[in-house]
Amino acid sequence: MAKTSMIIKAQRGSKFKVREYNRCPLCGRPRAYYRKFDMCRICLRKLASAGQIPGVIKSSW
């Protein structure tokens, strides 16, 4: 879990647009962020496995 101070710091607007970065709103993780789902890969996998994200299915071939 991310430090609370880092999550709050990321939510605040930056003086420069380039310095802003995305964080997962569920766990606060800054890396492996999927813009389409607005969450990190770990939370995406957890929610997709539970069937809580509509339209996402497990692939098999």
Curated annotation (Swiss-Prot):
Name of protein: Small ribosomal subunit protein uS14
Primary gene name: rpsZ
GO cellular component labels: cytoplasm; small ribosomal subunit
Family (UniProt): Belongs to the universal ribosomal protein uS14 family. Zinc-binding uS14 subfamily.
Organism in which the protein naturally occurs: Geotalea uraniireducens (strain Rf4) (Geobacter uraniireducens)
Molecular functions (GO terms): rRNA binding; structural constituent of ribosome; zinc ion binding
Record field: transmembrane: none
Any one Gene Ontology BP term: translation
Protein's UniProt keywords contain Nucleotide-binding: no
